[in-house]
Each structure stands twice: as structure tokens, then as C-alpha cells.
Amino acid sequence: MAQAMASMTGLSQGVLPSRRADSRTRTAVVIVRASAEGDAVAQAGRRAVIGLVATGIVGGALSQAARAETVKTIKIGAPPPPSGGLPGTLNSDQARDFDLPLKERFYLQPLPPAEAAARVKTSAQDIINLKPLIDKKAWPYVQNDLRLRASYLRYDLKTVIASKPKEEKKSLKELTGKLFSTIDDLDHAAKIKSTPEAEKYFAATKDALGDVLAKLG
């Protein structure tokens, strides 16, 4: 009996070390496999990054070459002449000419005296046509249109007056001074949104316009 127990004890002691060795071997194999798989994944990632970088470099080189070809095909001529010489653009460069005083940088196209007189009549009619806006109390529109037409009117009247003989200039200047005084009063009435004042100065402006147009003939 004792011998049997001893033999079993010896057998168990011999089996345990062998099992431990097997488990250690398996663990080592798993570690080696995991390390190999990790290296493979890292290598694949590096290859993908290198491929993307190479693609970007090639694409950039191709796009630069295409742009260079496009630039070669664009024909650049001489700069355009000042003011272009087209109708309505004779003073187009004056607004950008910083050597000129601000008041001399026109945004209105200068016209010959006869054409300026015709535009005076058009601007006068546009001012008279503001009456419906006054009746509707559309004050911002009244102010904007009045100021726009008055700027044309002032500019063209200066052109017309400058072309008149000396004896006619004085009377025309007096009439235009009265006209723009009433226009300023009408603008102020629209600013304060006063219907009675607007109607009063609109009538005065209309009469002053009639006097100026009659003088121009």
C-alpha cells in the first residue's frame, strides 16, 4: 500500500512539470503569433501611409504641370488705355485718381452743354414724379430719389451755365440757387416725415424747376 502511494505521488510529480512546460510553450507560441500579427499590421499601415504620400506628391506634380500649361496658353496683352474711350466712360478713371482732389473725382459723366440741358429736363421731370411717393409717405424713397436727381441736376446746370454768355449767367445762377434751396427744404421735410412741409416745398420746387427750364429755353 505504501509502495502504491509512493508510486502515485511520484507519478503526479512527474506529470505536473510536463503540464507546466506545455502551458509555457503554448503561451510563448501565442505571444510570438501576436507579435508577428502586430508587426504585419504595422507594416501594412506604413505601406498605406507611404502610398498616400506618394499619391499626393504625384498628384501635386501633375496639377502644377497642368497649371503651368494653362498659364502658358493665356495671352496677356497691353494694359487698356486710360478711360477706355467708350461712351459713358470718359472720366471713369477719375474716381481712382488719388492725385486729384476729392471734389474733382466725378462719378457723373460730363456731357456737352446741349446734352446736359436735355438731361436737366429729364432730371426735373423725375423730381416732379416724386409726388406719388410723397402722397404715400414713402419718405426713404423720396429722399433717395430726390438726392440722386438733384445731384444730376446740379452737375448739368453747372455745365449749361458755364456755356452761357456772361449776361445770362447771373440770372441763371440766381434761379438755380433758389431751386436748390427749395430742394434742400423738401429733403428736410422728408427727413422729418412731415407731410404738410413736404407738400409745401414740393410745390415750391416744382415752380422753381419751371422757372429754370423756361430760362434755359
Curated annotation (Swiss-Prot):
The keyword Thylakoid applies. Keywords: Chloroplast, Membrane, Photosynthesis, Photosystem II, Plastid, Thylakoid, Transit peptide. GO terms for biological process: photosynthetic electron transport chain. One of its GO terms (molecular function) is electron transporter, transferring electrons within the cyclic electron transport pathway of photosynthesis activity. GO terms for cellular component: chloroplast; chloroplast thylakoid membrane; extrinsic component of membrane; photosystem II oxygen evolving complex. It comes from the Eukaryota. InterPro entries: PsbQ-like_dom_sf, PSII_PsbQ, PSII_PsbQ_pln. Its main location: plastid. It is found in: Plastid, Chloroplast thylakoid membrane. Residues 1-68 form a transit peptide. Belongs to the PsbQ family. This is Oxygen-evolving enhancer protein 3-1, chloroplastic. The lineage of its organism: Eukaryota, Viridiplantae, Streptophyta, Embryophyta, Tracheophyta.
